[in-house]
């Protein structure tokens, strides 16, 4: 996998910071976007914010469409923009012991990436996760600037 970068702003950080609370909202993420179509010229963006499907800890669904500028409770998220109070990890240790929390797990249909697995373990420990949809950051990914992108950009409307 190529190098990934997230760029933030003071405004996004302030929204996440002001939304956090050591007891009620010990973990708050901002929002960035990902795509399942990384090799295509024009990637369809989806928020890296998910809810569990039918309580299954290995099945997730995008929170899409994304509510505008809202603080919402979610099941899991990407790990690119996270503010976490140390109480969250203390609670995880009470439930899971001293183990590795940031690793991939499962195979096939039960494969989950390291960020989703971290939040899965956090969820199982009873630590709530919130996302602020107004605290958006750029997720720098590789994509081609080619004719498909050109057509999409310029034929979208009749710009001079």
Q: Predicted segment positions?
A:
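C-terminal catalytic/acceptor-binding lobe
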Residues: 86-87, 91-160
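Active-site acidic Asp-centered loop
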Residues: 1-4
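Conserved catalytic core of nucleotide-sugar-dependent glycosyltransferases
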Residues: 6-103
């Amino acid at each position: 996998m190529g190098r990934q970068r997230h760029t933030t702003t003071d405004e996004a950080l302030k929204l996440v910071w002001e939304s956090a609370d050591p007891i009620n909202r010990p973990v708050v993420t901002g929002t960035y976007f990902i795509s399942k179509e990384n090799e295509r010229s024009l990637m369809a963006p989806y928020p890296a914010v998910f809810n569990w499907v039918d309580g299954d800890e290995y099945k997730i669904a995008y929170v899409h469409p994304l509510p505008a500028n809202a603080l919402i409770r979610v099941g899991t998220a990407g790990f690119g923009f996270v503010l976490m109070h140390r109480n969250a990890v203390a609670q995880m240790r009470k439930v899971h012991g001293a183990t590795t929390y940031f690793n991939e797990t499962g195979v096939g249909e039960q494969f989950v990436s390291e960020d989703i697995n971290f939040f899965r373990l956090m969820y199982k420990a009873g630590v709530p996760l919130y996302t602020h949809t107004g605290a958006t950051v750029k997720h720098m990914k590789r994509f081609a600037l080619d004719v498909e992108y050109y057509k999409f950009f310029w034929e979208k409307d009749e710009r001079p």
